[in-house]
A protein has these predicted regions:
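Alpha-helical transmembrane segments of multi-pass membrane proteins, especially transporters
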Residues: 106-109, 130-143, 163, 167, ...
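Catalytic-loop motifs flanking and including active-site residues across diverse enzymes
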Residues: 112, 145, 149, 173
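Generic alpha-helical transmembrane segments
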Residues: 101-118, 140
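Short hydrophobic membrane-inserting alpha-helices and related fusion/pore-forming segments
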Residues: 81-103, 151-169
């Protein structure tokens, strides 16, 4: 019950109205006529990426991929931060005030909910708690399993080595959740079990590499 209470408190930090406002930015100053250099435009106008994706299908996939990658890295960083506080601040900033919450479960879950809002907006879909109740419920339900696994693995591995699997699982769980949301909004269906398993295995490896890179930047002696 304490964890659910933490999630309820943390959810108040996520404002879908801000996502809707960002997605509604006027694009007159950004776009000429087609054909568009999608990568070049996104690089030159990153603050308009959500609005571009919402309005123009050509921009959706790269914008959604960037959202998934960014939030997955944020959650991996937070998993590292909870175990090794000095590993993060000088390299990255997690996107919001995570330190206010005692439960890492609450922080990681709510960051995924924020990702769900961003992906819905980029997909041209309605954004908000009421419109996305099913997706948000699935995020909350799925999150407890893989975060429990992360804690179990980290607890069985000597200090230092245990940081990598914890961060990798946080990364992978977030990444697969993002892929599932992307598929749902693009195709109207869920990923199959085989698709989830394959995506998870690939994402765990990506999460390991990212966590190792972060630790090497701050602690060169880390493996």
């Amino acid at each position: 019950m304490q964890v659910f209470g933490q999630i309820q408190i943390a959810i108040r930090q996520v404002n879908p109205a801000k996502v809707r406002k960002e997605a509604a930015k006027p694009l007159g100053a950004v776009l000429g006529g087609p054909p568009w250099d999608v990568g070049g435009i996104l690089e030159e106008y990153p603050d308009f990426s959500l609005a571009l994706a919402r309005s123009l299908p050509e921009f959706r996939r790269p914008v959604i991929e960037a959202i998934i990658r960014k939030v997955s890295r944020e959650n991996a960083l937070f998993a590292l931060f909870t175990a090794l506080p000095d590993a993060i601040p000088s390299i990255f900033e997690v996107g919001w005030a995570a330190g206010e919450f005692a439960s890492d479960t609450a922080v990681l879950t709510v960051n995924q909910i924020r990702m769900a809002f961003l992906i819905a907006a980029a997909s041209g879909q309605e954004v908000g708690f009421n419109a996305q109740k099913r997706q948000i419920g699935a995020i909350i339900a799925a999150g407890f399993g893989w975060r429990a696994l992360a804690r179990e693995l980290a607890g069985k591995i000597p200090f230092g080595e245990g940081l990598i699997p914890k961060a990798a699982i946080a990364y992978a769980g977030t990444y697969v959740a993002g892929l599932g949301l992307e598929r749902y909004y693009a195709m109207g269906g869920a990923m199959t079990a085989a698709m989830r398993e394959a995506a998870y295995e690939k994402a765990v490896e990506g999460g390991k590499q990212f966590a190792q890179w972060v630790l090497r930047r701050k602690h060169p002696a880390c493996p």
